Design a protein with these regions (language model features):
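Beta-strand-rich domains and repeat architectures in extracellular enzymes and scaffolds
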Residues: 4-82, 103-110
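Repeated scaffold domains used in trafficking and secretory/extracellular systems
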Residues: 52-59, 103-113, 145-156, 194-205, ...
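Beta-propeller fold detector
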Residues: 19-23, 95-100, 138-144, 185-191, ...
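Blade-loop segments of beta-propeller domains
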Residues: 52-58, 72-74, 80-117, 123-125, ...
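Residue-level signature of beta-propeller blades and closely related beta-rich strand-turn architectures
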Residues: 25, 73-75, 126, 166-167, ...
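Beta-propeller blade signature
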Residues: 82-92, 172-183, 220-227, 280-308, ...
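Conserved beta-propeller blade signature
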Residues: 18-20, 66-69, 119-121, 159-161, ...
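Short, conserved, GDST-rich strand-edge loop motifs in beta-rich repeat architectures
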Residues: 69-80, 164-171, 265-297
């Protein structure tokens, strides 16, 4: 299987932009397709801040100068909604804004992506919206599960793949596929064997086959996408959670880079327990200061699984502190062979050199 860089060229299905989706593209490599800031001697960066009193989740880029902000209601708001804004690149002020978009009552960070057809697709709660570049709603779809969904993948046929998030062990996470014109559902939902919290990633191999990677509570799975359907790859099912739940909890998102599926464990924390204690999610929200307090006693760990062989699972412990937690994927620089791991709960960041022959070597910690 061949690993490419999302930043090398236009991604099939995605708009021709330096940053058309969260993490920069479906492999979640977080590398922008741009030459950098090109700051010269005597030049400097200045900062501009705008506060809108809402939960600002992410930004994506469309044409040059077009920046779109996805957000949703403030945690204390009685109205549960999402929104899309086109913002000025210098002042950050709103140029145009969608109406408040119903979320089915859920408060959770969704996602936004720019499709190669020029439209933007927004997910908030259990709704999906299609919007034009002026933030006007073109189509909307209530999704099948009474659950929050966490963002999209765009496949090369233009379809959207989504998954609902489930914290409870006895709940089912399911894939749903929507066509991009009217947001009609394509085929039946596909159930995942374990509840899943993290966002999905996608890779394309040298034969052009698309693989969707999804974290389960104990196991990472991948599904082959073909003819608008998803089929579980039973030859690749690495089990990463090997300790009891008091010691180790689930993974969130993965980064697909340089022949590996990279992810962190210990994703559970006090915020999750509070947010997912109600349905719709987020009716009760955690007290400030408790959000990132981890529930697992084992220190944060970084994993790499070879995408050709799930038996080649490597793990390293970058930090020594307990009760850490994470919400996001690690990063791996395939040029310099450096992995970036973190522990949000304890405020730690580390860089680790990796080679397939020698494994991990810690370079620094902050």
């Amino acid at each position: 299987m061949h690993i490419n860089l999302d930043s090398n060229e236009k991604i099939k299905g995605y708009y021709d932009s330096p940053w058309p989706a969260e993490c920069g593209g479906p492999r979640r490599q977080k590398i922008p397709r741009s030459p950098g800031l090109n700051i010269s001697n005597g030049e400097y960066l200045s900062q501009k801040t705008r506060a809108n009193g809402e939960w600002n989740v992410m930004m994506v880029l469309r044409d040059p100068g077009e920046v779109f902000l996805l957000g949703n209601n403030h945690s204390n708001s009685t109205e549960k909604y999402g929104f899309l804004e086109k913002i000025d690149t210098y002042s950050l002020e709103c140029i145009s804004r969608s109406p408040n978009l119903p979320s089915g009552g859920h408060t959770w960070c969704g996602g936004v992506v720019v499709h190669e057809n020029g439209y933007l697709y927004l997910n908030n709660g259990n709704y999906c919206y299609k919007l034009d570049p002026d933030c006007k709603v073109v189509a909307s779809k209530k999704l099948p599960q009474n659950s929050a969904y966490n963002s999209f993948l765009i496949m090369k046929d233009g379809n959207l793949v989504m998954k609902n998030i489930e914290h409870a062990w006895d709940a089912k996470s399911k894939f749903v596929i929507l066509e991009p014109e009217f947001l009609n559902q394509v085929a039946d939902e596909v159930a995942i064997d374990e509840n899943s919290m993290g966002r999905i990633a996608m890779d394309i191999d040298t034969q052009g086959t698309q693989w969707v990677y999804v974290p389960g509570r104990d196991t990472f799975f991948r599904y082959k996408y073909e003819k608008a359907s998803l089929t579980l790859d039973q030859s690749w099912m690495p089990k990463y959670r090997t300790l009891n739940y008091e010691e180790q909890s689930f993974s969130w998102d993965a980064c697909i880079s340089d022949g590996g599926c990279w992810f962190l464990d210990n994703g559970d924390n006090r915020a999750n327990v509070t947010i997912f204690s109600t349905r719709p999610f987020g009716q009760d929200l955690p007290a400030r200061g408790s959000v990132f307090q981890g529930l697992s006693s084992s220190p944060q760990k970084l994993f790499r699984v070879d995408i050709k062989n799930d038996k080649k699972l490597e793990v390293v412990q970058p930090f020594d502190k307990q009760r850490g937690s994470i919400f996001s994927p690690p990063a791996f620089d395939p040029i310099h062979k450096v992995a970036i791991a973190f522990d949000t709960g304890n405020g730690l960041l580390a860089g680790l050199n990796y080679s397939k022959d020698l494994g991990f070597k810690k370079l620094w910690e902050k």
